[in-house]
């Protein structure tokens, strides 16, 4: 009989064995490598299943007539088809062996899906039918397994024990059981005879396992490898054939298929190596030492890793919201804006916000439209920085007179003086709370609006000034509310002058006003600021009657000329605050306005105009303005040309434009605080 090389070591042949071999000697790789020892222990547990696996594969192959390999036993059984076939074979064999009393053994037809795939639902169904049959024939629940245990190979030991129990049951009806079941019966008979006679001598019982010499040599080899160096050696004492004494225990040892040395333990079987690992005092000490070392190893790893883990793992970056805002500001300050601007910007933004609730109570006619467009504003805050400071200066110069001209429309006879006083009156009315510098921020946006309406930019791709404009519009609801709520009282001419440059039509085109248009504004509008304050007072009173402004009217009539010539910063503020008023009026034109129906909504006007159109618009604005200055009495219905007078700026506007780039930079630096301030103010 040829034996496997891994088995020959039990019979005195020295062959190198790997720890993965199921029949490796009990001492294993040693305690130096704990992980390797754990792996070896797992292999030893698998080794206890190998004898049952081989025995069952031989038994099933004989019953079913199919060659089943021990290594692939679970793969052959996991779809449940062979198990259902086993039921039919066993029932037929029970009928043939016990034709007289077949009623004791339950006979039933078990449904089976023969083409079930491994791991499929049908495989689970076949396995469930087999387990149902096992319960009917009397298999105890302790031997049964779950369907998943077989289908997914989760519990091979329980599957083997169940098959062995079926072999024990069918052996009662004359069916040949597995060899392990035969050995169990021999041992049971031997124990019964020994207990009955009370003798320790061996009783002559036919042994089907193997010859006595082979079994004894295998037991000696396993027990003495490695040699024990203890003072009180714990050895296996031979009593009789297949009977040994280990300490106070009597062991029944059998050889299975000439390869496996099996020990009868309780109601099952174990290999001699596994049994010695559990019950030999020397090996128990070895196991205890191993367990302690494993626990110490695990605790050591956990204790060492806990203090070291914070040092190994890099610290996450500190999440400081202010640092994120500072980074945002630095990225936006790349065009050359000073770093100290955001602080001033915060102050300037907070001041209008503090005054906003006082005047916002008066009305809410203009605010809905601006608030409706506010969601667009935060989308692209960083882009307004792209506009150069020169462009900002040009923007500041251009709209300063556009407001005055748009307000001058009610009185065509005295357009320049009326417009100037109108701007003065609006400035006086708005800036009386001593915050002229605070209004500088909205001034630039108003200039952006006026220039964007009448001078479509050459760089239409930059959409962000619109959003900034809307952002500041919502923050300046007070000025627009005062005029927009009372806008229906304005003359039709004023309405015709304002609806045409609808503040929200092409605001995306703001960023790059041409220098030519700026020059035109300087040339054409240098005259009106020097008009007589008398007509300015008349127009101021006219504005007071039309707009119903309470306190600033008297101030406006008295000092329009002085403020016009003296303080150009205040003129810029007046333009800034007057422009939102005109915007508010444009949003709410009077019912008598003939131009309001022709105004295009913001949602429709999305395509920016080309640079050539910008040139023509500026030229037409210039010519229209000259024509109206020459003939001071055009009808009120012919006010659309006045809308083209908005881009040119006065001398004051040019001067203020020189002063306002810093304010423009402050405006464009940080829009985060502008938006949050508006939100808080709305609450």
UniProtKB/Swiss-Prot annotation:
GO MF annotation list: actin binding; microtubule binding
Compositionally biased tracts (Polar residues): 397-424, 512-533, 541-582, 606-621
Positions of the GAR domain: 210-283
Phosphoserine, modified sites: 559
Positions bearing Phosphothreonine: 435
UniProt keywords, alphabetically: Actin-binding, Cytoplasm, Cytoskeleton, Microtubule, Phosphoprotein
Gene Ontology cellular-component annotations: actin cytoskeleton; cytoplasm; microtubule; microtubule cytoskeleton
SUPFAM superfamilies: Calponin-homology domain, CH-domain, GAS2 domain-like
Family (UniProt): Belongs to the GAS2 family.
Protein name: GAS2-like protein 3
Originating gene: Gas2l3
């Amino acid at each position: 009989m040829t034996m496997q090389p891994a088995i020959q070591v039990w019979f005195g042949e020295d062959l190198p064995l790997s720890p993965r071999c199921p029949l490796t000697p009990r001492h294993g790789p040693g305690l130096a490598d704990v992980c390797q020892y754990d792996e070896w222990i797992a292999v030893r547990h698998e080794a206890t299943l190998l004898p049952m696996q081989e025995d069952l594969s031989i038994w099933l192959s004989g019953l079913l007539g199919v060659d089943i390999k021990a290594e692939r036993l679970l793969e052959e059984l996991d779809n449940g088809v062979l198990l259902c076939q086993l039921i039919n074979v066993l029932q037929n064999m029970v009928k043939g062996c016990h034709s007289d009393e077949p009623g004791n053994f339950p006979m039933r037809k078990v449904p089976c899906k023969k083409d079930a795939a491994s791991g499929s639902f049908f495989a689970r169904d076949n396995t469930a039918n087999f387990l149902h049959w096992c319960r009917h024939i009397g298999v105890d629940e302790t031997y049964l397994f779950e369907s998943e245990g077989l289908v997914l190979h989760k519990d091979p030991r329980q599957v083997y024990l169940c098959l062995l129990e079926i072999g024990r049951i069918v052996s009662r009806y004359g069916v040949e059981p597995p060899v392990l079941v035969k050995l169990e019966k021999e041992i049971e008979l031997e124990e019964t005879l020994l207990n009955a006679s009370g003798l320790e001598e061996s009783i002559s019982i036919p042994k089907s396992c193997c010859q006595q010499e082979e079994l004894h040599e295998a037991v000696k080899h396993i027990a003495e490898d490695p040699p024990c160096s203890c003072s009180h050696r714990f050895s296996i004492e031979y009593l009789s054939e297949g009977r040994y004494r280990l300490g106070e225990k009597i062991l029944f040892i059998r050889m299975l298929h000439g390869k496996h040395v099996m020990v009868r333990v309780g109601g099952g079987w174990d290999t001699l190596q596994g049994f010695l690992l559990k019950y030999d005092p020397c090996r128990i000490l070895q196991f205890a030492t191993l367990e302690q070392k494993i626990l110490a190893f695990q605790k050591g790893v956990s204790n060492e890793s806990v203090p070291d883990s914070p040092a190994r793992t890099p610290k996450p970056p500190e999440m400081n919201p202010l640092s994120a805002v500072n980074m945002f500001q630095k990225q936006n300050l790349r065009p050359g804006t000073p770093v100290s601007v955001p602080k001033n910007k915060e102050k300037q933004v907070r001041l209008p916000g503090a005054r906003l609730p006082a005047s916002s109570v008066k009305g809410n006619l203009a605010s809905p439209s601006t608030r409706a467009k506010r969601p667009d504003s935060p989308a692209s805050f960083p882009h307004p920085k792209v506009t150069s400071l020169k462009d900002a200066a040009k923007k500041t110069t251009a709209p300063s007179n556009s407001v005055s001209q748009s307000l001058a429309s009610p009185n065509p006879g005295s357009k320049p003086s009326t417009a100037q006083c109108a701007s003065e009156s609006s400035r006086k009315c708005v800036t009386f709370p001593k915050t002229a510098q605070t209004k500088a921020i909205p001034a630039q946006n108003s200039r952006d609006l006026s220039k964007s309406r009448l001078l479509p930019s050459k760089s239409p791709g930059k959409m962000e000034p619109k959003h900034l404009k809307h952002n500041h519009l919502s923050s300046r609801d007070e000025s627009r509310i005062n005029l927009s709520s009372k806008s229906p009282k304005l003359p039709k001419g004023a309405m015709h002058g304002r609806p045409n440059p609808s503040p929200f039509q092409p605001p995306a085109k703001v960023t790059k006003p041409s220098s030519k248009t700026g020059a035109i504004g300087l040339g054409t509008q240098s005259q009106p600021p020097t008009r007589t304050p008398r007509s300015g007072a008349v127009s101021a009173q006219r504005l007071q009657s039309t707009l119903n402004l309470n306190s600033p009217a008297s101030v406006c009539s008295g000092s329009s000329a002085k403020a016009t010539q003296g303080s150009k910063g205040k003129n810029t503020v007046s333009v800034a605050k007057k422009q939102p008023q005109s915007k508010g009026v444009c949003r709410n034109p009077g019912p008598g306005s003939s131009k309001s129906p022709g105004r295009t909504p913001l949602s429709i006007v999305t395509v920016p105009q080309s640079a050539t159109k910008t040139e023509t618009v500026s030229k037409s604005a210039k010519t229209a303005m000259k024509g109206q200055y020459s003939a001071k009495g055009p009808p009120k219905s012919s006010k659309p040309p006045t809308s083209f007078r908005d881009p040119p700026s006065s001398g004051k506007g040019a001067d203020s434009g020189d002063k306002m780039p810093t304010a423009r930079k402050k405006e464009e630096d940080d829009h985060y605080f502008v938006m949050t301030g508006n939100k808080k103010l709305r609450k």
